Amino acid sequence: RGPCQRVPAIATMQNEPAHSDATGIFKDFKLSEEDRYELYVASWMHDCGKVVTPEYVVDKSTKLETITDRIHEVRVRFEVLKRDAEIDCLKAIIAGGDAAALQAALTARLAEIDADYYFIADTNVGGEFLDDDAKARVKTIAEQTWMRTLNNRVGISIEERKRFERTPAPELPVVEPLLMDREDHLIPYEVQPFSADPDNPYGFKVDVPEYKFNKGEVYNLSISRGTLTNEERFIINDHIVQTAVMLENLPLPKALRRVPEIACGHHEKIDGTGYPRKLTGDQMSVQARVMAIADVFEALTAADRPYKDRKTLSQSLRIMSFMAKDNHMDRDLYHLFLDSGVYRDYADKFLLEDQIDEVDIEEYRVA
């Protein structure tokens, strides 16, 4: 069962406690059967815009990954450094140098190269927050050099050749940094996203990066959290823009007139810093705020994402508590989510056994 099936399940489960809240904050929130169906349709359609999102961006699981993971290319450069070190050592021995001292220096240098590579490889995974010291080490490693003797502008696509032509070709052989942010790594937009227009008819308020993609190696490896660059995150976030355009141009019947608003609110935040319209909680319907909680919980607990490990119930609720505290999701609906036991009902139906751990909901309440 994929997210398109799981999100409707959570949203439907979460909606009922709000409907049944006779004396609390949601006592005036009542649902007809048409309302329930409207939410159901909206939850099925909430990510329909992803049909135009490149799959390799959605599934990007390492920092250097594009269509393939460029860590393999980077690893070969480290191998070249090791071969060069061995060749330099042998040349020095042949020239009459102290063999024992040179061999000891070689052993130390090879160990240093190995350590640098494994640091870069670990950084590529993006599992931990990358602090300033780690970013500085990436740059230091990148400044090491290797010699390229072959022309890198042959055997490539027309588009890539055009990007290379922005800069003069160096004379070969050329000494280059081990890791680079090159001009040809910057890929411009063919057409500027219409959502960037402040006068767009949909009310989108988005910040558009200067480039469509930035494939710089140091730039990507220096991502602070996760594996996505700002450019890639914009492309992924654009799915909700496309969802809104699709749904708002459908001739929906009156009973489904709020489907676009409900479906397209799951990336908005209560404090108005969300996407794509920067709506505040007061500007969102209860159903749209329910969708936001459903989408977050499904994403955190999903076991079928290639770019992240699945989280347990307790891990997921802890993250959601931080989001509620920061006014990124509706605090009252989040508490209702806990008190009603929706999280547990969903877990029993959809989560793997090793994800369902003991949960004390009092630990995850937000004052």
Give the location of each predicted region:
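Histidine- and acidic-residue-rich, metal-dependent catalytic cores
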Residues: 1-367
